[in-house]
Regions:
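Domain-level detector for long C-terminal conserved domains
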Residues: 2-26, 149, 155-161, 171-301
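Class I SAM-dependent methyltransferase Rossmann-like catalytic core
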Residues: 60-100
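Conserved SAM/SAH-binding beta-strand->alpha-helix loop
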Residues: 146
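Short beta-strand element of Class I
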Residues: 138-141
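N-terminal auxiliary segments of SAM/dcSAM-dependent transferases
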Residues: 1-57
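Conserved class I S-adenosyl-L-methionine
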Residues: 105-115
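Conserved SAM-binding loop of SAM-dependent methyltransferases across substrates and taxa
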Residues: 116-133
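Active-site catalytic pocket residues across diverse enzymes, especially alpha/beta-hydrolases
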Residues: 93, 97, 127-131, 157-161, ...
Length: 301
């Protein structure tokens, strides 16, 4: 009974730390959120979940996470560098000119294999900095096979969204990519733009197997589309990005597949201190426009 109570107390303590971190995200942005998640790690997770155990349980973070402790460890290890990379690529593709005019826009954002929605948070951070969103409607579609991670993603997007004036809705899908494409291919409503975010997923073999079906889906969504993909400098990731680019039709290449790097301040779990480190990645940005079925029929007639 004593051991059980201690375990329950430890779980509650982690949950409180994560809730505090989410509040920091809402109040101050991603950097403070990351610092608070590192605080959760050093408060005790480093003892209960050392890196070697985490790497074994998650196949070095390649399989879906199963606990909040694993999510905290993942964020401590990779969250800041992943955010900085995606944030850098969004700014490079979409530009750094501030848009102060209050225009009306509806935007769908699909975050595939979203994890803790790092890509969506980076997009929200960009919008907060550069775009007047008071007349925006943002529809987030978060696709993630881990329920634990998906719940955290919904919380974080909710918190970060409160920093901008847009009307935001969040649609969570506790599914892998294959199931999402089979069962939910009709979910996106009418929008001025649909953004498709891929952060550290196109190097995964199971995702690459779905690229033909994924491209059919991307071409079925009406209107203007943008694909932003970022991942590690692994051979599998180059393969996944090139496969996606070559499988899509009539695209405008905003950013071809290319290496890049950013500097991040991260916490080293192996050395137990903060450090500045260059984070290396591969990026790609594509745009295309799909004609509606009704328009195609009218044109053919």
């Amino acid at each position: 009974m004593i051991a059980y109570n201690q375990t329950e107390k430890a779980v509650q303590n982690v949950a409180q730390h994560v809730a505090h971190a989410a509040d920091q995200l809402q109040l101050h942005g991603f950097d403070r959120y990351y610092n608070a998640m590192v605080g959760a790690y050093v408060s005790g997770i480093y003892k209960s979940l050392p890196y070697s155990t985490f790497a074994h349980l998650t196949n070095r973070a390649q399989t879906p996470l199963t606990s909040v402790e694993q999510a905290v460890m993942y964020t401590t290890l990779y969250g800041k560098s992943h955010f900085d990379r995606f944030n850098s690529v969004i700014a490079q593709i979409m530009g750094k000119n501030k848009r102060t005019e209050a225009i009306t826009r509806t935007i769908n954002i699909v975050d595939y294999g979203c994890g803790q929605a790092i890509a969506s948070l980076a997009l929200l951070s960009y919008l907060e900095k550069y775009v007047n969103c008071e007349n925006f409607t943002l529809n987030f579609y978060l696709v993630e096979p881990s329920q634990t991670t998906l719940d955290l993603a919904v919380l974080l997007v909710t918190k970060m969204s409160s920093r901008i004036a847009a009307n935001v809705t969040i649609h969570p899908y506790h599914k892998d990519l294959e199931c999402f494409l089979k069962e939910d291919s009709e979910v996106l409503g009418a929008a001025d733009y649909s953004m498709h975010l891929f952060s550290n997923v196109l190097d995964i073999a199971e995702v690459q197997q779905q690229i033909p079906r994924l491209c059919e889906y991307l071409h079925s969504v009406e209107g203007k589309q943008m694909v932003i993909a970022v991942g590690p400098q692994y051979s599998n990731n180059y393969q996944g990005l090139q496969q996606l680019k070559c499988s899509l039709s009539d695209v405008t290449v905003k950013q071809d597949v290319a290496d890049f790097s950013v500097e991040s301040e991260i916490y080293s779990v192996t050395r137990n201190h903060w450090k500045h480190e260059r984070s290396y990645g591969v990026m790609m940005g594509l745009c295309f426009k799909n004609i509606s079925t009704a328009s195609q029929t009218a044109f053919a007639a």
